[in-house]
Amino acid sequence: MEKIFERLMYASRWIMAPIYLGLSLVLLGLGIKFFQEIFHILPIIFEMTEVDLVLVTLSLIDITLVGGLIVMVMFSGYENFVSQLDVGEDSEKLSWLGKLDSGSLKNKVAASIVAISSIHLLKIFMDVKNIDNDKIMWYLLIHITFVLSAFAMGYLDKMTRK
């Protein structure tokens, strides 16, 4: 009975495989939104102010960072929790594949969240005159929370690896 239970439990990791594959659909959606934004600004780029162009650029960078985060979670999550990725010898392999354990992945995800939060905060500061002070305070507090959490996770990871 114990062997059957353990085999079933071990096999249940494959439930995560379609979830990781589903993240690729989210990635596709981000790609569509990215190019939708590009095609939206192209006809009006000469009429845009510099501030508006910077804000659009920050939004595009934000989408790119989220996309990178999705790729990192998809691949390393699959490798850590489901099965090793067997890409052919003739295809190029990402240098970090197989090297991110769950602790490293958490740190990279936390760093990505801080970077994404920083982009959002920069967008807020560029439009500061149109945003309530209370909202700015909350954005700052949330960002500081992300930064402190990422720092604490990195510190704890460093302490446990000693």
From Swiss-Prot:
It is found in: Cell membrane. The keyword Membrane applies. Keywords: Cell membrane, Membrane, Transmembrane, Transmembrane helix. It is a multi-pass membrane protein. InterPro entries: UPF0114, UPF0114_bac. The chain crosses the membrane at residues 10-32, 53-75, 136-156. The keyword Cell membrane applies. It comes from the Bacteria. Its main location: membrane. GO terms for cellular component: plasma membrane. Disulfide bonds: none annotated. Belongs to the UPF0114 family. This is UPF0114 protein SO_3997. It comes from Shewanella oneidensis (strain ATCC 700550 / JCM 31522 / CIP 106686 / LMG 19005 / NCIMB 14063 / MR-1).
